Amino acid sequence: GLPVCGESCFGGSCYTPGCSCTWPICTRD
């Protein structure tokens, strides 16, 4: 949904619940 999760995912994973990796940043669903 919302574009920003406040997390980067250079390693390929997001640790914030409800977020997915759109490299290199995490995006919310």
Swiss-Prot record:
PROSITE patterns documented for this protein: CYCLOTIDE, CYCLOTIDE_MOEBIUS
Processing and modification events after translation: This is a cyclic peptide.
Disulfide bonds: 5-19, 9-21, 14-26
This protein's UniProt keywords: Disulfide bond, Knottin, Plant defense
Cyclopeptide (Gly-Asp) crosslink site(s): 1-29
GO biological process: one example: defense response
Keyword presence, Disulfide bond: yes
Stored Pfam families: Cyclotide
InterPro entries: Cyclotide (IPR005535), Cyclotide_moebius_CS (IPR012324), Cyclotide_sf (IPR036146)
Source organism superkingdom: Eukaryota
Coiled coil: none
UniProt function note: Probably participates in a plant defense mechanism.
Protein family per UniProt: Belongs to the cyclotide family. Moebius subfamily.
Entry domain remark: The presence of a 'disulfide through disulfide knot' structurally defines this protein as a knottin.
Name of the featured protein: Kalata-B15
Lineage: Eukaryota, Viridiplantae, Streptophyta, Embryophyta, Tracheophyta
